[in-house]
Amino acid sequence: MLNDQRSRFYVTVFVASLGMGMNMYFIPVFAQSFGATFVDLGLIGTVWALATTITPFLMGYLAGKMKCVWVYVLSLTLNAFATLFLVLSRSVVDIIVLRFFGGIGMEAFWVTAEIMVTDLAPVEARVREMGRYGVALVLGVLIGPLIGGVVTQSFGYINLFIISTVVIGVSTVQALVWLVSGYRGTETLPSQSFSGYIRIFKRLLPLYMRIICYGIIWGLITAIFPGYANSIGVSAVLIGFLFSAFGVARLFSYATAHRYSRFGAKRTLLFVSLVIFVGLLTIAIFPMFLPLLVGMMLIGGGVGVVFPVTIDIVSRNFPDERATTAVASYETAINIGGTVGPYIFGMLTVITTIGRSFLLMSIFGIFMALFAVNGTTKARK
């Protein structure tokens, strides 16, 4: 029964991520149609990430007070409306406002979905189940940009947002029908003291710093890269293809993440941090389609390993009944990075070229590697 519930849950994740993936990477290009500069794109990415930063602990709190599955349904509903209202955009300011609400909706989806994985999976199977969840998520994001690129090229942005809304709506109905009635969350046990959490955060500080650097790179890829690719003449269809290739690499890494545990967390995270760094360098130095494709696949492959391995380390340092806190802390650290990353890039483009800005931002891949060495040695295995 539990396996059936997990399978249905993963289907809803796939459909929802398909709908979101169809449009999310094209919003920066859509903003450029209203005259958005790279500073504007940085601001859009920063506002979106700011919304995602304030969301995790709120969602974790709600998930602790009510059935997590209802919070999941609410998150899907928020995403549907945030996507639909993009149809009404008439300026860059409109997009900035709507991206704030879109950030809340998308982060609510990610956080509650990750909490549900920890609810439905035994502790010893969390890396494997996080990998399966990642496969469902990335399959949608893999196929979505391809469909979104074709729809945009053929029918325009308005129809893209409408179709995306319908797909997300389907996942909402699936969640209501398949998950609500039979969902069994983890039993609430006495929580650890506040001072206990402070000790955990101090012990994991290098790891959280690494996650922040990872978030900076994630914000750069999702908020800035589409506009960068568009500015050097890459079409909407090919931008969709680049993100689908990014998704293929993530998918492979998610599906095989549990195999890397035999090498140890420190070695694994150090290696993938360097892979991400090389991917960023490739994008910065060679602004042509094929090098961009290679760079995106390197980054995607690294990202696919970072998520399940890191969240497993974080969750093992929290009491089992406080998995929501572990997930929320992980997501908040990522979103702090995602908030400052696009803003830093936007400011760099004012004083130097776009390519050099990417080159300078690649240093965060090195920071990830340095924090990987320190962060995993202090974490409890």
Locate predicted features:
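Paired small-residue
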Residues: 93-101, 279, 290-298
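Juxtamembrane intracellular "pre-TM" segments in multi-pass secondary transporters
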Residues: 1-3, 180-211
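Helix-to-loop junctions at the C-terminal end of transmembrane segments
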Residues: 55-67, 253-265, 349
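Structural signature of the two symmetry-related core transmembrane helices
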Residues: 70-84, 165, 267-281
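Cytoplasmic helix-loop-helix junction between adjacent transmembrane helices
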Residues: 100-137
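Helix-loop boundary and gating motifs at the non-cytosolic
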Residues: 2-45, 49, 205-211, 215-228, ...
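Helix-breaking motifs and short loop linkers at transmembrane-helix boundaries and internal kinks
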Residues: 35, 67, 88-94, 105, ...
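Residue-level signature of mid-helix packing/kink "hotspots" within the transmembrane helices
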Residues: 49-57, 141-142, 247-255, 338-339
